[in-house]
């Protein structure tokens, strides 16, 4: 009997792949309508995503075959959803992120900021959080965490091991950061990130048996501050994490008449304050939880001499690592300049409060802007393949003396093909296909009619419940899959109750990044947990409070500065459809400005 159960468990994924579609067949058979056919496809994909029976990207391809076979959409129409402008923006942004990582610019920025903040306990945690959050705004959460955790643990080990050396009159100024070697990296890759999938490093933290209780708690706080700030930092920019791009794509797909409400500038103006507030509150919470409330000690005020010497030794670790990078190379300078140019192009294309370069240069006769944020990102991405990585000159080929050799470009396609997370591109496309199929089949209108009773529930209460549910759900499932499934439903609900769609879609998107409680919730958590020194209970205890804080901050944002920014107190004309005629006859249910 035991062998039978073991066999079933071993083949559980194969069983799920065949049994789930069969078990759902009564729905389209008993209700032979397009709405039921589309619901069958959505439920099937949701179950595949939740159970990991198929890879996320493979599941995202199902609309390409299911929708045409069920008569919901033509195959050519479904295919168009897989490379929309949002996907182009994602690809262009990641081209620059790959260049930043390839030329080690992110490490130089990180170490420089840590040299400025110093190594006092509270400021050290703040320094790591600020650096990780900033990096996660522009590159993968996983990549920023994988880079920052070894640096954090190198500093921790120096702080823990230097006291005896200081007492003997010696220190360890030549300590070198031990990066995880390729041979020791695990092959496990998690797709639940905002972009680039990375191997999980398998470098363990020093055993807690040789630490004092105070040292162990400080190391736990340092580890958690890195993974938490990676998730928080991704909130701030439109390209920072996949759910943000899912929202922009769903807005374009579900409400094609909207005047580009969600763009890089508008998202940054709304989400950056959320990131700052959440980062500061998280810093205070981790400080209280792991360092105690002795702020004088945490900030290094009136320290004893041996404590100062220990921190000086740890500071030298960071200095040594920064010196090992050498002077800033031409490639780093070129990537940094292109990075600044791209950010400026994103902010000034169509800022809203003045005419940007998109309005002034690239608009048609009717005044419609012809370029998008994706256009700017691809333009800079192409330049990465055109700009040489060294100052052009008469460079000798080291393999063939006497022959000239041109330096390589900042990026090459082999590197991009290896680093680019094509699975996320397909996942985004699958989400847009689901939204379009739901609209074409009439399922969105049917859901909206069924959700009409929610019109009598206060909008803030509705949003609060949505945030709690999403924050809980995203602890166990991909944040991208969560938003892909829920945003079309929430959009239909908003139309049904005459509520601005962004009033429920924005909180859902932001809450999907509140994955703080479990190691499996997001790759940054898994990376930190794999280094050792943490128990699941440690992460859950710290994370549950951060989830609550995050939900409250989102509620504050959506009911304060979010209202005038997105005009959330009105029901927009671009959200009107045949199912919202009742919204014209009655005042919209919306939050007060």
Swiss-Prot record:
Gene Ontology annotations of biological process type: alpha-ketoglutarate transport; cellular response to lithium ion; fumarate transport; succinate transmembrane transport
Record keywords, A-Z: Cell membrane, Ion transport, Membrane, Sodium, Sodium transport, Symport, Transmembrane, Transmembrane helix, Transport
Biased composition, class Basic and acidic residues, residue ranges: 185-194
Effect in UniProt of substituting residue 83 to C: Decreases cell membrane expression. Decreases succinate transport activity. Decreases Km value for succinate
Consequence of changing residue 474 to C: Does not affect cell membrane localization. Abolishes succinate transport activity
Membrane association type: Multi-pass membrane protein
Regulation: Li(+) decreases succinate transport in the presence of Na(+), by competing at one of the three cation binding sites.
Annotated family: Belongs to the SLC13A/DASS transporter (TC 2.A.47) family. NADC subfamily.
Disulfide bond positions: none
Keyword Membrane belongs to the record: yes
Pfam families: Na_sulph_symp
Phylogenetic lineage: Eukaryota, Metazoa, Chordata, Craniata, Vertebrata
Distribution of this protein across tissues and organs: Abundant in kidney and small intestine.
Keyword NADP tagged: no
Primary location group: membrane
InterPro entries, per the entry: Na/sul_symport_CS, SLC13A/DASS
Stated role: Low-affinity sodium-dicarboxylate cotransporter, that mediates the entry of citric acid cycle intermediates, such as succinate, citrate, fumarate and alpha-ketoglutarate (2-oxoglutarate) into the small intestine and renal proximal tubule. Transports the dicarboxylate into the cell with a probable stoichiometry of 3 Na(+) for 1 divalent dicarboxylate, rendering the process electrogenic. Citrate is transported in protonated form as a divalent anion, rather than the trivalent form which is normally found in blood. Has a critical role in renal dicarboxylate transport.
Protein name: Solute carrier family 13 member 2
Result, substituting residue 86 to C: Does not affect cell membrane localization. Decreases succinate transport activity
Subcellular location, record wording: Apical cell membrane
Region ranges (Disordered): 164-204
Coiled-coil residue windows: none
Start-end of Polar residues biased regions: 164-184
